[in-house]
Amino acid sequence: MADIHILVADDAAGQRLDAYLGANDGCPTRSACAHLIEGGAVAVNGETCLSKKYAVRSGDRISVDLPEPHDPTDVIPEAIPLDIRYEDDYLIVLSKQRGLVCHPAHGHESGTLANALVYHCGIDHLGTVQGEDRPGIVHRLDRDTSGLMLAAKDDDTQRALQNLIRTRTLDRRYITLVHGHIAMDEGTINTGIARSTRDRVKMAVSDDPFARQAITTFRVLERFDSTRFDDGYSLVECHLFTGRTHQIRVHMRHINHACVGDPLYGKCDARADQGLTRQFLHSWRVAFDHPVTGEHIECRDELPWDLAAVLDDLAPRSLGRTAAGDEIVPQLGLLEA
């Protein structure tokens, strides 16, 4: 994915955002820019902007995430099983398994969640606001992050769900196991996040004026004692108020408590990572008011077997649960000691 950064000049003030971007070198056509805006790929002054009619102002800092080019005709239906937790005429809440890429990209031409959604719903019954090569996708999970995510069956619902993310009214909570003992039981991490200048695969905390604001709150659920191989662990629930690429993984590394098993931001020590071959990160709960019916929807997802096995192995080393842990851990499907 390429990044474009633009500082709006005085003589451009007042132009519509889609028209302004479409006239800039390096950006696609105006209509394509409109799709990028509606898909959440454009930020103004660090905040995602979903309105193509936004009138740019002198000094605005605009960032555009350009997806890698991909032929949308490649999104063919494939009979990949979907673990659906809620479905109606407008949207789907599903649990994504580890190893499943959300949409086709270079190196992953098929076998993606998008291919599965096209098979399940039909290409004409999925939102295309994110682009025709990302049918139905409202928000993404990293390939090896498991758990709950949303898909939309039409453009209006897709826009409405993305607006819930923008207005921070889509409640998304994740479970992660991190290295070390986090001293405080709860806290908030509020930083800018931008692509790393050292490694373009990674994201990094940044004070660059074009960085996007990222807010994560966390609650420690349980701590586990240290050994000669590791510094102990903390089981944590993270609440996303924004949805930046690798946000939880970057924020946990930023406070010196990287996610266990994380190949990009972690310690890369097999013993300290409890033998995991992927980051210990699971989207366990989503809650929101249905954008069409108004019904309150809440779905929960127990930990998959590989993550649950790690916690079962660590159970004898438990230093005790917090009040939040007493509430949440029993809902994760773990074996009780």
Regions found by a protein language model. Give the residues of each.
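RNA pseudouridine synthases
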Residues: 1-188, 192, 197, 300-316, ...
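Pseudouridine synthase
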Residues: 109-121, 153-157, 166, 191, ...
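Short coil-to-beta-strand transition motifs
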Residues: 76-79, 206-216, 280-281
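Conserved hydrophobic positions within beta-strands
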Residues: 84, 178, 218-220, 259
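Short Pro/Gly-enriched beta-strand edge/turn motifs at strand-loop
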Residues: 64-67, 198-202, 213, 265-271
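Short, acidic, Ser/Thr-enriched surface-loop or helix-capping motifs
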Residues: 37, 215, 240, 290-291
